[in-house]
Amino acid sequence: MRPFHAYSWIFSQQYMGTKNVKEKNPTIYSFDDEEKRNENKSFLKVLCSKRGVLPIIGILYIILNGNLGYNGSSSSGVQFTDRCSRNLYGETLPVNPYADSENPIVVSQVFGLPFEKPTFTLESPPDIDHTNILGFNEKFMTDVNRYRYSNNYEAIPHISEFNPLIVDKVLFDYNEKVDNLGRSGGDIIKKMQTLWDEIMDINKRKYDSLKEKLQKTYSQYKVQYDMPKEAYESKWTQCIKLIDQGGENLEERLNSQFKNWYRQKYLNLEEYRRLTVLNQIAWKALSNQIQYSCRKIMNSDISSFKHINELKSLEHRAAKAAEAEMKKRAQKPKKKKSRRGWLCCGGGDIETVEPQQEEPVQTVQEQQVNEYGDILPSLRASITNSAINYYDTVKDGVYLDHETSDALYTDEDLLFDLEKQKYMDMLDTSEEESVEENEEEHTVDDEHVEEHTADDEHVEEPTVADDEHVEEPTVADEHVEEPTVAEEHVEEPTVAEEHVEEPASDVQQTSEAAPTIEIPDTLYYDILGVGVNADMNEITERYFKLAENYYPYQRSGSTVFHNFRKVNEAYQVLGDIDKKRWYNKYGYDGIKQVNFMNPSIFYLLSSLEKFKDFTGTPQIVTLLRFFFEKRLSMNDLENKSEHLLKFMEQYQKEREAHVSEYLLNILQPCIAGDSKWNVPIITKLEGLKGSRFDIPILESLRWIFKHVAKTHLKKSSKSAKKLQQRTQANKQELANINNNLMSTLKEYLGSSEQMNSITYNFENINSNVDNGNQSKNISDLSYTDQKEILEKIVSYIVDISLYDIENTALNAAEQLLSDNSVDEKTLKKRAQSLKKLSSIMERYAGGKRNDKKSKNFDTKDIVGYIMHGISTINTEMKNQNENVPEHVQHNAEENVEHDAEENVEHDAEENVEHDAEENVEHDAEENVEHDAEENVEENVEEVEENVEENVEENVEENVEEVEENVEENVEENVEENVEENVEENVEENVEENVEENVEEYDEENVEEVEENVEENVEENVEENVEENVEEVEENVEENVEENVEENVEENVEENVEEYDEENVEEHNEEYDE
């Protein structure tokens, strides 16, 4: 057989004939030629035997072959007729033209083929970002090639907006050429390439014309929306980039697919027709996607330009109204002078008095109504279309989640509404003043007797009006006086002024050195005791100082809790850049819609964020703050989970880079050889000591830094294995905890009404009390159920934060020790410095056992305060809503205090036991570890000396002696220290805890507490002693093995060298002899 050559004339003659295709490639459409030959063999012999028959048959064959046959390459062997071929190129597609056909047929994608299903439908287009045009092309080429024998028209997106594929005259003529391919003769192979280039040029010209059409359309945006030139050029440049990238990429993909098909040995004409139609579908799909993407890009932030234009018009109107008002006031002295002359002279020329200019004010009012109703939606309408704050409209069925709305009610929208309200107040005030002045003028005209007094009043009026006009545009008096929560809430924070004002004096002196910012309200600055120019570090430091002072004493009275609550409110506002900007500009009006969290929950999240230099802000803290501050339900959070995950992925990379950079900064002095490099680190850790969950966080950081450093030093296999095992275990546990947390939050915080138990704001105080539906609400549960649920939630949050912290610290440390821009020697120094940092942290961590106990204690402690905050805030809300008299409020406060005392009694035993156990175990462990370390060091030195002399003989004996010495020393020291420490610590801790927490309790309860404490202490001490002994033995064995191995190697090398030298000398002596 000849080798294949796709471009030769011989190939076209050999493989493009119907007869050859029938013989070599029979299909289901061809007849069985052999059977027909056998049946008609005798009949052919009879015909051929007669004269004149053969020439007649030959002529008929030529005629019929020219009219009915075709010169194609179809592997099916079926003649190309309308009955059994595809009609893909008609201008209108029939519903089902082959429904009554008995023969096998090949149809288009409208009817589908067996086992061929589209990857998506028009109702659910592919989830690809509108700026990712290359990703769209890749997805489209996969979908459009879904069918093997037909084309997938459903892959064309956005057909409801930009129309499907329409076959115009140019495409219709081209499809006719493809249908008639081979009928006119010639080289079909070359014709295929020519026609492919032709359809590519047709579609590229259409695509280029689309670019001109879009540019012409969007160039009108500059005039229509007064879009800045820079913004327009930036958006259009992005569109041009998408158009060029998409066109080049699609052309390359289509040409590549055609060339791969064109190089095959057997070319199917039907497959070629499918490829030409695929070309048309592909360019149409890309055109639709480009139009959609450009529309999204050009329409983004279009509301901002509308807002700017609206504010400009409002500002112009306000200035115009003010100018008219000033002219009117300037004309008042002339009017008064003319009235005095008329009154004195008994009448005068009335026509000399100029008419009052009331028309501009009326037109301003009409324009205000028209523009507010027609041009810009109200604040309520904006919130109705919001995609984030739609919790209040979902239940009413008003929310429409459609891409055309683009109605995220952002911070910019809120600022715009506040700014607009300011100008509206200015216009309303100017109109009211003009009306009042007109009324006063009429009363002056009527009251002739009080002429002089009236004149005096009118002379003084303009100055007062000027002052009012100057003050009102900042913030209207109505908005300043009304929203003050209640006189209790505003005045009570001043109780903390004794604690606030004294330390604030130094702070304010430094902050007031800069130019003072003029703000309408400084209440929150006064609560934190900082100046209005204070930076974020100063505000944060001051918040933690005040919060840690008030936190332990919340239950002692309503005043302390109120101070703690106000401190948290102040930091929620001033600690956030956007809220601080609103507060500085608009005062109380700017934060009326801010949703404040339960103070203890906010303190919990802030405490987890306190270690952000080493860990960054944990992801769960960021998500929960967004969750609570926006008052989103769990259903809302699930709807926005994809966008949040994308944001958190990007944030995680920045977070790891920040931690890695911070580690490098604090370790650089150690790398450089500074002996005092650890002083600032110890100061930093001392400042973090005592925070909520400080021990678990430091223990996680210590463990990660230690083993990551070891993986980059000698004997890294064990640490690498431990890291891998811990990472896998964390992933499994994290998945389970995430599911548990989500299910718990969904059950108790699944709706906006359920969120009212832990959030509140100043504008909708009443709505925070009612719970219209029958869903579970934390505030409605019993004390035991509340405690159980909240302990679960807090425990889940802390566990997720710890796993997140470990993962972040691991990645940041790996980045630090895998820097390609640094040599190996420097990387080794970094690893050694990181290991030293973990040793410093170990002093503050306290070990794994203290880690768990401290976490459980902090969890129970903070849950108690959360419950106290929920009950207190709900009581205040109900009292304000029902206008309860003062004596009822007093009784409510007494009830709250009584409940707090009961809670203290309930938790007192746990606190006493916990403190006693911690102190006893801590002292016992310190003494055991200290004595064990001294003994181990002495014994190891003895072991090393003995090993140098006789390695093989003395190793076993020394190890046994070490173990015996360690056990004896440990037992002796532990028994002595434990007895002394138990007696001292138990007596001290029991007396202190009993005096502080159980002064009001009965003597019987105190005795029970003491007995329980002694029993628990004895049990825990015995367990801890055994565990310490086991740990010491393990450490001794590891140290001995390491030292033994090193010494053995050294001794072996020395012995080998001495032995070799002696043998050489003996050999030389023998040789000389």
Swiss-Prot record:
Which InterPro entries does the entry mention? DnaJ_domain, DnaJ_domain_CS, DnaJ_X, EMIR, J_dom_sf, PRESA_N, PRESA_N_sf
Reply yes or no: does the keyword Membrane apply: yes
Q: Specify the glycosylation sites in chain numbering.
A: 71, 639, 773, 777
Alphabetically ordered keywords of this record = Cell membrane, Glycoprotein, Malaria, Membrane, Repeat, Signal
The record describes its membrane topology as: Peripheral membrane protein
Q: Which residues form the signal peptide?
A: 1-65
Q: Where is there biased composition of kind Basic and acidic residues?
A: 445-456, 476-502, 894-930
Q: How does it get modified after it is made?
A: The Tyr residues in the variant tetrameric sequences in the RESA repeat are possibly phosphorylated (by homology with band 3).
Region of interest (Disordered), residue spans: 428-514, 894-1073
Identify the stretch(es) annotated as Tandem repeats 1: 436-504
What Pfam families has UniProt attached to this entry? DnaJ (PF00226), DnaJ-X (PF14308), PRESAN (PF09687)
Region described as Tandem repeats 2: 891-1073
User: Where in the cell does this protein reside?
Assistant: Cell membrane
Q: Where is the J domain?
A: 521-589
UniProt lists compositionally biased (Acidic residues) regions at 428-444, 457-470, 931-1073
Mention any one GO cellular component term assigned to this protein in its UniProt record: plasma membrane
Would the keyword Signal be found if you checked this record's keyword annotation? Answer: yes
Known function: May disrupt the normal intermolecular interactions of the cytoplasmic domain of band 3 and thereby facilitate the invagination of the red cell membrane which is necessary for the formation of the parasitophorous vacuole.
In Swiss-Prot or TrEMBL terms, this protein is called: Ring-infected erythrocyte surface antigen
- Species of origin reads Plasmodium falciparum (isolate FC27 / Papua New Guinea)
